[in-house]
C-alpha cells in the first residue's frame, strides 16, 4: 500500500439545534452535522447494522437488495456503478462523514472499492443535494457516517463469515469511552476466490478473485461543555481481478488504496453552533495488463479540504446556516493519459429555515461554487414540509444541482476536453406520507431535467472524445412501505419499495441505457425470542443496453429471493445461516457478466 503518511490538523464543530430534537454532544458525536438538518425536509432511509449482515459481501449487494438504487456490476466483486432515479453513477454522490468522496478521475465511485463494514450509520437519500453535498448529488447520495459515543465504557464485537466461492469476511470493532473521552477502532478483511459458474450461460467467473482490507480509527475529547475535538480516519487496500471469458485469456487486475482522515473542532451553545473541519483524502490505483507483470498504468490523487458549517437560531422559529468550503485537488498519472494536475475549488452556501409551527417548516438555500478554469452555475434549493393531520404529511423539494467534469473528462490524452461546462439539473419531487397505526406508506413522484450531459463519443480520428451533448428528462415514482409490530415475544418487520423510472434522451426520445423501468425490493423479518428469520426479494424489470431500445440486447427481467435464519444467546452470541438466490435465477446487471446462482454462507457474532 503506497500511501504516504499524512498528518491532518483540523477544527470542527457539530451542532444542530432544530427544536431540540437532536441528541447533544454529551451523549454522541456525529461527524456529518448537516445530515440531521437534511432529515427535517427530505426522506432519508437508514440501513441498520443488523440489516447490513443480510448482504454482507459488498456495499453493491447491500444497496441492490435494500434500496431504490440500481447497481450495475461487471460480475460479482468487479467494477460497480450506482444510480438513482434513472441517472448514472456520475449523478450519484458518495459522502463520507459529510465529505464528498467521488473520484476526481472518474467523477463517480466504484462501490466495490468502498468498504462496507465499520460505519455507524449508512443512509440513502434520493433527490438533489448539491447545495449541501456538492458535485454529482443530482439523482441522490449515499452517506457513510461515523459517530462516537460517550459514557459507554468498553464495548467490542467480532464478526466472521464463510461463504460459497471461497469467500471469507472478518470484522472486529472495539471502543472505550467515559464522560469526556471516546475512542473506537475497527478492522475488516474480506477475500473471495469468486469462481462461480453459471452453466446456462456457459460462463465461469475466471480470474474473479478479490480481496480488501480496511482499518478505521476514531477519537473524540470534550475540552469543555461547549468545545469538542474529534478525529476519524479510514485506510483501505483492495485488489480486483477482472473476469475473462476463455481459459487461456489474458488475466488483468486493478489495485486501489485510499486514505481518508478528518479532524474536527466543534463549538456549541443553545442557539449557536459552529463546525470547522479539515480533511485529507488520497486515492491511488494501479492497473495491471498482466497480473504477473509490473503495473501498466496508474494514478495518485490527493485532496486537501477545509470546511466550516455555522448554524444560528435568530429566534426559536428562524434559523440561518452558512457553509464554506475550500479544496486543493492534485493528481499525477502514470502512463494513463493523465499528467500532473492541480486544481483549486471552493464554495459558499447559505440556508434559511423557518418553523412557523411544529407541523410546518420551510427551507431555502443558495450556493456558488468557484472551480478553477470552470464556470459554475449558481445553485439553489427550496423545501417545505407539512404534517397536515396525524395520518398524513407532505413535502416538496425544488433544486438546481450540478456535476463538474472529472479529471479524465478534462485532461485525458487523447479525447479530453478543457472546454466542457458542468452538467446542471432542475429537480422537483414531492413526498406523500400516510400512517395507519404501525403501517407507513410513502409515495414520492419526481422529475429531473439534465442539460449539458457529458458523454464520450467516437471520433473520425480513431479515438473517443468527450463532449457536452444531449438533454435528459427523468421522471417517475419511488414508493416505500414499512410495518413493524411487536406481539409479546413475537416481532414482525416489513420494509418494501417500488421504483418506476423513465429516463429519456431528448435527442432520440429513447430510454437511457442501464435504467430499469421497474425495480422492487422487499425485506421481511420475523423474531421470536432469541430466533430471527428473514426473507428478502428483488425484482428488476427489462433493462435496455443499447441506445435504440433493441429488446434482443436488453437484460431480461429477473426475480431473486434470499433468506436467512439466526439465533442469539445472552444477547452476546449469534450464529446464522444465509441462502442467497434461492430461486437459482440466472441474471445479469451488465451484459455478458452473469451474477452467482444459489449460494450459501454461515456467520457468527460475539458482542462484549
List the predicted regions and their residue ranges.
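Gram-negative outer-membrane beta-barrel transporters
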Residues: 357, 447-449, 468-545, 571-572, ...
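Flexible loop and strand-edge segments within Gram-negative outer membrane beta-barrel domains
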Residues: 192-198, 202-214, 222-303
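C-terminal beta-signal and adjacent terminal beta-strands/loops
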Residues: 450-451, 539-546, 565-608
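N-terminal periplasmic "start-of-domain" segments of outer-membrane beta-barrel proteins
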Residues: 25-53, 81
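Outer-membrane beta-barrel signature, preferentially recognizing the C-terminal barrel domain
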Residues: 247-268, 374, 387, 393, ...
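Extracytoplasmic beta-strand/coil segments of soluble accessory domains associated
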Residues: 60-99
Amino acid at each position: 500500500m503506497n500511501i504516504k503518511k499524512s498528518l491532518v490538523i483540523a477544527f470542527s464543530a457539530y451542532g444542530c439545534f432544530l427544536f431540540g430534537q437532536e441528541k447533544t454532544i454529551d451523549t454522541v458525536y456525529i461527524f456529518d452535522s448537516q445530515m440531521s438538518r437534511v432529515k427535517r425536509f427530505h426522506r432519508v432511509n437508514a440501513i441498520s447494522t443488523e440489516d447490513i449482515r443480510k448482504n454482507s459481501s459488498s456495499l453493491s449487494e447491500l444497496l441492490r437488495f435494500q434500496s431504490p438504487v440500481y447497481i450495475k456490476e461487471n460480475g460479482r466483486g468487479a467494477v460497480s456503478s450506482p444510480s438513482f432515479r434513472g441517472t448514472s453513477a456520475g449523478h450519484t454522490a458518495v459522502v463520507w462523514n459529510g465529505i464528498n468522496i467521488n473520484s476526481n478521475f472518474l467523477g463517480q465511485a466504484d462501490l466495490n472499492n468502498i468498504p462496507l463494514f465499520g460505519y455507524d450509520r449508512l443512509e440513502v437519500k434520493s433527490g438533489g443535494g448539491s447545495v449541501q453535498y456538492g458535485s454529482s448529488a443530482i439523482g441522490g447520495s449515499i452517506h457513510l457516517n461515523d459517530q462516537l459515543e460517550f459514557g459507554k465504557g468498553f464495548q467490542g464485537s467480532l464478526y466472521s463469515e464463510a461463504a460459497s466461492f471461497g469467500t471469507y469476511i472478518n470484522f472486529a470493532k472495539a471502543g472505550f469511552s467515559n464522560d469526556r473521552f471516546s475512542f473506537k477502532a475497527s478492522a475488516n478483511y474480506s477475500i473471495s476466490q469468486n469462481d462461480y459458474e453459471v452453466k446456462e450461460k456457459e460462463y465461469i467467473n475466471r480470474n474473479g478473485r478479490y480481496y480488501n482490507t480496511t482499518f478505521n480509527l476514531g477519537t473524540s475529547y470534550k475540552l469543555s461543555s461547549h468545545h469538542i475535538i474529534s478525529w476519524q480516519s479510514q485506510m483501505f487496500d483492495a485488489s480486483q481481478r477482472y473476469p475473462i471469458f476463455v481459459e487461456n485469456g489474458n488475466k488483468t487486475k486493478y489495485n486501489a488504496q485510499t486514505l481518508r482522515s478528518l479532524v474536527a473542532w466543534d463549538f456549541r451553545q443553545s442557539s449557536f453552533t459552529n463546525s470547522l473541519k479539515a480533511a485529507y483524502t488520497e486515492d491511488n490505483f494501479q492497473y495491471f495488463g498482466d497480473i504477473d507483470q509490473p503495473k501498466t498504468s496508474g494514478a495518485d490523487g490527493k485532496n486537501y479540504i477545509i470546511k466550516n458549517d455555522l448554524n444560528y437560531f435568530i429566534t426559536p422559529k428562524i434559523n440561518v446556516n452558512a457553509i464554506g468550503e475550500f479544496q486543493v485537488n492534485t493528481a499525477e498519472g502514470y502512463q494513463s493519459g493523465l499528467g500532473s494536475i492541480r486544481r483549486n475549488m471552493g464554495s459558499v452556501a447559505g440556508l434559511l429555515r423557518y418553523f412557523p409551527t411544529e407541523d410546518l417548516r420551510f427551507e431555502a438555500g443558495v450556493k456558488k461554487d468557484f472551480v478553477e478554469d470552470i464556470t459554475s452555475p449558481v445553485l439553489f434549493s427550496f423545501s417545505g414540509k407539512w404534517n397536515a393531520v396525524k395520518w398524513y404529511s407532505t413535502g416538496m423539494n425544488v433544486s438546481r444541482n450540478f456535476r463538474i467534469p472529472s479529471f479524465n473528462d478534462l485532461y485525458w490524452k487523447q479525447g479530453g476536453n478543457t472546454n466542457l461546462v458542468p452538467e446542471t439539473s432542475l429537480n422537483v419531487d414531492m413526498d406523500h406520507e400516510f400512517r395507519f397505526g404501525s403501517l407507513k406508506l410513502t409515495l414520492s413522484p419526481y422529475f429531473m431535467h439534465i442539460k449539458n450531459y457529458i458523454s464520450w463519443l467516437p471520433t473520425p480520428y480513431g479515438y473517443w472524445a468527450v463532449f457536452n451533448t444531449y438533454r435528459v428528462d427523468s421522471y417517475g415514482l419511488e414508493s416505500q412501505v414499512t410495518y413493524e409490530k411487536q406481539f409479546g415475544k413475537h416481532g414482525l418487520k416489513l420494509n418494501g419499495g417500488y421504483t418506476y423510472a423513465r429516463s429519456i434522451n431528448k435527442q432520440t426520445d429513447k430510454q437511457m441505457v442501464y435504467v430499469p423501468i421497474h425495480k422492487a425490493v422487499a425485506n421481511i423479518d420475523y423474531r421470536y425470542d432469541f430466533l430471527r428469520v428473514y426473507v428478502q426479494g428483488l425484482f428488476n424489470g427489462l433493462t435496455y443496453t443499447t441506445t435504440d431500445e433493441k429488446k434482443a440486447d436488453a437484460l431480461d427481467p429477473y426475480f431473486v429471493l434470499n433468506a436467512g435464519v439466526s439465533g442469539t444467546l445472552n444477547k452476546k452470541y449469534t450464529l446464522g445461516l444465509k441462502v442467497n438466490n434461492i430461486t437459482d435465477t440466472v441474471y445479469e446487471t451488465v451484459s455478458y457478466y452473469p451474477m452467482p446462482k444459489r449460494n450459501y454462507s454461515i456467520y457468527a457474532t460475539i458482542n462484549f
